[in-house]
Amino acid sequence: MALPLIKPKESEESHLALLSKIHVSKNWKLPPRLPHRAAQRRKRVHRLHEDYETEENDEELQKKKRQNRDAQRAYRERKNNKLQVLEETIESLSKVVKNYETKLNRLQNELQAKESENHALKQKLETLTLKQASVPAQDPILQNLIENFKPMKAIPIKYNTAIKRHQHSTELPSSVKCGFCNDNTTCVCKELETDHRKSDDGVATEQKDMSMPHAECNNKDNPNGLCSNCTNIDKSCIDIRSIIH
């Protein structure tokens, strides 16, 4: 049995030297290196993520736009409502102002009329005051009594003997002194008493004459000397001539 021939292992240097000596008859172009699939997958995921974020951003943007439109619409509505309320308020206040102006003008005219009337009344009062000052004042009660005076029927006066008796009973005797006078002076009290007695006698005589019945008296037997006609002024039996004389 023959043994194989074992040759020594060639070194790498010799192998490289051999390769460098090889000459290629054609120029070959190596194709570009293709990207790795993982890198492509990452790029695709990144692109999808960007697209998703763009869509989300678009939705948020649209939502914000809708909110802005709604807010602007609500603001315009509130503004229009407020303007309408203000216009109505201005209109009502204008009516109130016109009413007050009309009332003010009317009151001013009334005030002028009252002032004119007051001035005229003051002048009239001054005139009447001057007239009343020139005329003597008269009591209104007395004036009323004079205007409404009604004469009364005459009543016969009866002589009262009791009064005369009382007067004679009150007379002081001549011997009694008043206590203020003496024998050497004139007593004033006695003189006054004498004058008073004379006046009482005159009144009694006049009353007696007035009570005397007329010749045509129907009741001469009456102790008073009067009849039913004596008390009637229209049918009196008293002689007026005796009273006058």
From Swiss-Prot:
SMART domains in alphabetical order: BRLZ
Q: Where is the composition biased (Basic and acidic residues)?
A: 68-77
Domain of life (superkingdom): Eukaryota
Q: Which residues form a coiled coil?
A: none
Composition skew (Basic residues), residue ranges: 34-47
SUPFAM superfamilies membership: Leucine zipper domain
Annotated spans, Disordered: 34-77
Entry keyword annotation includes Cytoplasm: yes
Sequence segments annotated as region (Basic motif): 63-82
Stretches the record annotates as Leucine-zipper: 86-114
- List each copy of the bZIP domain by range: 58-121
Q: Name one GO molecular function term.
A: transcription cis-regulatory region binding
Where is the protein situated, by its record's location annotation? Cytoplasm; Nucleus
Keyword list, A-Z: Activator, Cytoplasm, DNA-binding, Nucleus, Transcription, Transcription regulation
State the PROSITE patterns in the record. BZIP, BZIP_BASIC
- What is the role of this chain? Transcription activator involved in the regulation of genes expressed in response to environmental changes and metabolic requirements. According to genome-wide promoter binding and gene expression studies it is a coregulator for the expression of ribosomal genes, while its own expression is induced by the cell cycle specific activator SBF (SWI4-SWI6).
Question: What binding partners and quaternary form does the record give?
Answer: Homodimer.
Q: What else is known?
A: One of 8 closely related fungi-specific YAP proteins (YAP1 to YAP8), which all seem to be transcription activators of the environmental stress response and metabolism control pathways and to have similar but not identical DNA binding specificities. Present with 238 molecules/cell in log phase SD medium.
The record's similarity note reads: Belongs to the bZIP family. YAP subfamily.
Q: Could you tell me what this protein is called?
A: AP-1-like transcription factor YAP5
Name the species this protein comes from. Saccharomyces cerevisiae (strain ATCC 204508 / S288c) (Baker's yeast)
